[in-house]
Amino acid sequence: MSLSNSLGLLGRKVGMMRLFTDDGDTVPVTVVDVSNNRVTQVKTEANDGYDALQVAFGARKASRVTKPAAGHLAKAGVEAGEILKEFRVTADVAGKYAAGTVVPAADVFAVGQLVDVQGTSIGKGYAGTIKRHNMSSQRASHGNSRSHNVPGSIGMAQDPGRVFPGKRMTGHLGDVTVTTQNLNIVRIDEARQLLMIRGAVPGSKGGFVTVRAAIKAKPTTAAKGAN
């Protein structure tokens, strides 16, 4: 499923735990709360030039909502959310929902499905090139003095006489948007609207994430045989 026609869900990273299979194997999973994903606007080709669903998640105080946003949400009949995101979908998918509809997890995902999870990575603060870019340390001795954990030369001579843009150097590590691809949904708790996704997802506990169908998922053997 391509990125342009897949509905996703917004959620909050609850934390990690493990599940046990019937064979006794342990599976590490990340629990993502995707409850109360509500549609705030349905965009159509006729009115907006493309088909999309605008979805809100979380809760925000009324005093923290701007007047234009408050009017937009009041028109849809939904409460303000902490985050608002738009998903490009097909006309068929857009026609299934109306403004104010709560999208359940089972409507979008299924157990065994591969998904991409996007979030903000944990900030690590100012870091050197070894930690930030996985560079190697220099020699501990044999002529090396006070240059053990530095990157070394960052340029050339008088020509070009400058450091090229994009040179990997020290700086802020983390706190950037990261997408982890092709993660498997192990279980869906429909009662509590929780997704249990195998492996780790970006961000810290309590961080917001976006879950959508994997765009680089390889077809299964059964699907190949069907073709």
From Swiss-Prot:
PROSITE patterns recorded: RIBOSOMAL_L3
**GO molecular function terms noted in the UniProt entry:** rRNA binding; structural constituent of ribosome
Q: Which GO terms describe its cellular component?
A: cytosolic large ribosomal subunit
Q: What does the UniProt record tell us about how this protein is modified after translation?
A: Methylated by PrmB.
Give the keywords, sorted: Methylation, Ribonucleoprotein, Ribosomal protein, RNA-binding, rRNA-binding
InterPro entries per the record? Ribosomal_uL3, Ribosomal_uL3_bac/org-type, Ribosomal_uL3_CS, Transl_B-barrel_sf
Which BP terms does GO give this entry?
A: translation
**The keyword 4Fe-4S is assigned to this record:** no
Instruction: Please give the Gene3D superfamilies that the UniProt record associates with this protein.
Output: 3.30.160.810, Translation factors
Listed as disulfide-bonded, the cysteine pairs are: none
Domain of life where this protein originates? Bacteria
- Summary of subunit composition and partner proteins: Part of the 50S ribosomal subunit. Forms a cluster with proteins L14 and L19.
Family statement: Belongs to the universal ribosomal protein uL3 family.
- Classification via PANTHER family: 50S RIBOSOMAL PROTEIN L3, LARGE RIBOSOMAL SUBUNIT PROTEIN UL3C
Its biological purpose is as follows: One of the primary rRNA binding proteins, it binds directly near the 3'-end of the 23S rRNA, where it nucleates assembly of the 50S subunit.
Q: What is this protein called?
A: Large ribosomal subunit protein uL3
From which source organism is this entry? Answer: Polaromonas sp. (strain JS666 / ATCC BAA-500)
